[in-house]
Structures are given as structure tokens and as C-alpha cells.
């Protein structure tokens, strides 16, 4: 919400993930294009208190932002995986072995605890979003690698942190002047509640997001 108030149109995040596939190795970077939600009770919408909206979310990552992010990883000489499915778990505990094996059976590619809610809220705010999933470990499924520990994650994440900074710098330099994707109008056909039925308090609270559709001037 704060990003929207600041006028942000493009958003790229970076976070640690575990790999669920042999080919996604520690220190690789994945730019996922799909998510599976295994969280419980997290706030992941701006709506529901007097206004109902249902955004299209079949493709949760901005294709333009994803391409720019992937190209930027390659431009700094690092291994990038274009696309993949990120399973978002509740945490803060890591997976059990049974869960890790199940997600592999489901053909998930990486596992993390944060990015899905970011993607949902960014889409509702009509912000173009992509994430750099920094592989730090093989979760706990791999028989030839030790179980994930915080120490392991931090060590690999620190090594990837400098890479992420370089990549984000490249991303910013490659952003187009104007957006042509559908993200910028994600709410245009998503608002179900009649304009005159939206409470004045809600209209005011959500003015940065709904203003252009409800003819609200901030």
C-alpha cells in the first residue's frame, strides 16, 4: 500500500528459497512464474471490508518484469531459471520430509515463505511484480545433501546478496518508460461492489488503489 501511495509502478523482490528439483542448484536464481499457496490465514487482499473485487490471477507474475529480471540475471553472468512454480508455505518452521517429498510429487520447483502475498497485493495495487528466488539449499528431500539449517541459508544468501544487488541495478536500468502490460489495469473489471454502495470510509482508505475507478481525488 505504501508503494502505491509513492507512485511505484514496478516492483522486484529478492528472497531465499529452497530447491525442490535437482537442476535448481544452490546459488542459482529462479524467476518463478507460478505460485501454490500453502499458507493459512495471512492477509493477502486490500478488499473485503465494504468492497468486493476479484482480480485475474492466472498469471501472477508480470511477464514484462519477469523477462527483464531474467535478462538482468544473465547480464551479470549468473545462472537463471526462467519460470517455475514457487510453493509458499506458512513457516516459520521448515518442511517435514513428507511435505518436501509431496511438493516434489506435485512438480513444485522452489519453496519459500513470503512471495505469494507480495504478488497478490501487487496485482491488486496494479503494480508490475516479479521476484528473484535465490536458491540456498535443497530443502530436506535430497538424500545427498544435509537438511536445511539457518546457518546454511544465511551463508548462501550472503553470497547471493551481492548478486541480487547487481541484478536489481540492471533491472532498474532496463525498465521501459511506459507500461504496456495488463497489470496497470488489473482492477478495471474486477470491482464487483457498486460504486454508490462502497462506504465512504472505505473509499477514503483505499483511495490510492481505487481512486481512478471511483473518481476519487486524493
Residue ranges and their predicted role:
Residues 180-218:
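A short, charged, Gly/Pro-tolerant segment at domain boundaries
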Residues 11-15, 31, 80-83, 87, ...:
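General beta-strand structural signal in soluble alpha/beta enzymes
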Residues 49-93, 125:
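Histidine/lysine/aspartate-rich catalytic loop segments that bind and position anionic ligands
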Residues 72-109, 185, 192, 196:
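Active-site/ligand-binding-proximal alpha/beta "capping" segment
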Residues 113-150:
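Zn-dependent metallopeptidase/amidohydrolase metal-coordination segment
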Residues 140-188:
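His/Asp/Glu-rich mid-to-C-terminal helical/loop segments that flank catalytic regions of hydrolases
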Residues 1-58, 214-218:
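Metabolite-binding pocket within alpha/beta catalytic cores that recognizes anionic/polar moieties
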